[in-house]
């Protein structure tokens, strides 16, 4: 999926506003994913998955850091996320549908924390961004 110049601007502006809260929001989105889509828990048998878990927060920060990297490389997502794509496809073997689940929970989390800034245009741009990231992460599954 190609991000338009307006999409790129919306993604960058949103990520700038998120700033230091990215890790917190990543953890919250991951908690939402586990609560809303319990099958996603199967990839984390070694984690304490209770609400507020330090392990979930730490992994949520990793997710947020990867998205921050992606937001900084919107013109080369495959290059920026190549190692992460290899990891998810070849080692972790995460079912691609889980990226859609997490993307949805990220949108909900961001909208709940920034309702005024979460306009329909921003929502659409972030949805396209998360979809593009998901496409890159699943590109090496073939």
UniProtKB/Swiss-Prot annotation:
Organism: Ursus maritimus (Polar bear)
Sites of Phosphotyrosine modification: 25
Domain (Globin): residue spans on this chain: 2-142
Pfam families documented for this protein: Globin
Residue numbers bearing the Phosphoserine modification: 4, 36, 50, 103, 125, 139
GO molecular function terms noted in the UniProt entry: haptoglobin binding; heme binding; iron ion binding; organic acid binding; oxygen binding; oxygen carrier activity; peroxidase activity
Chain residues that bind heme b: 88
Binding sites annotated in the UniProt record for O2: 59
Protein name: Hemoglobin subunit alpha
Entry comment describing in which tissues the protein is expressed: Red blood cells.
Gene from which the chain derives: HBA
Physiological role: Involved in oxygen transport from the lung to the various peripheral tissues.
């Amino acid at each position: 999926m190609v991000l338009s110049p307006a999409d790129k601007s919306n993604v960058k502006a949103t990520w700038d506003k998120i700033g230091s809260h990215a890790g917190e929001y990543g953890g919250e989105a991951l908690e939402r994913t586990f609560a809303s889509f319990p099958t996603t828990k199967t990839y984390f048998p070694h984690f304490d998955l209770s609400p507020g878990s330090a392990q979930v927060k730490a992994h949520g920060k990793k997710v947020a850091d990867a998205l921050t990297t992606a937001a900084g490389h919107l013109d080369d997502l495959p290059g920026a996320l190549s190692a992460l794509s290899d990891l998810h496809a070849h080692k972790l073997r995460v079912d691609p549908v889980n990226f859609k689940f997490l993307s949805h929970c990220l949108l909900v989390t961001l909208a709940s924390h920034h309702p005024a800034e979460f306009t329909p245009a921003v929502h659409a741009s972030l949805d396209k961004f998360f979809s593009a990231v998901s496409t890159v992460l699943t590109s090496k599954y073939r």
